[in-house]
Amino acid sequence: GQFPLQANTMTIGRMMQQAGYTTGCFGKWGLGYPGSEGTPNKQGFDRFYGYNCQRQSHTYYPPFLYNDEERVYLSNKVTDPHRSPLDKGADPNDPASYAKYTQKEYANDLIFDELMGFVDANKRKPFFLMWTTPLPHVSLQAPERWVQHYVKKFGDEKSYTGQAGYLPCRYPHATYAAMISYFDEQIGQLIEKLKAEHLYENTLIVFTSDNGPTFNGGSDSPWVNSG
């Protein structure tokens, strides 16, 4: 990823701009590194907020995100999501052993807030919103309330200690389910917003995914697909 689109590429953002829409992209961008011709603001998007770094997009607690072309630093510590196995000697069954992988600012919360702000700012004119959420891509990190919801449903389970890449996780099945449910919750909030602003009946929503079954990062697709 990150190989930049060429300056003259016809993107869906450009097409919508030409049709008179204000355009926004929120989430993960991998079509042009910062400073290149492939950044969202140079490829048809009036507004961008999210990840423009493939490595940091594999943790939900990144040290920075991008607000249009500007890097915005967060309070999270730098973590390499591909080289952070469980500490040597740590108890894999103790939730405290995984505490350092949960930091202060959860990127998806920040991205969703900006997305909803975009809807507010453009609700009285045509807008095109592309929401490229990283959920439920690994690493396995989700709001604790949703994780505990599924821990109660699934019971105890084998920890994921990082042996197949990405960050360790005490409750991998519960956390993967939590990520999906959290995304579903946010979709519901967006739809309710559209309804409250009397936009829903005049809005086309297209849901698609580029993430097929994955075997790494503790996601355990065979277990998920067995349900």
What is each PLM-predicted segment?
Residues 1-227:
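Formylglycine-dependent sulfatase
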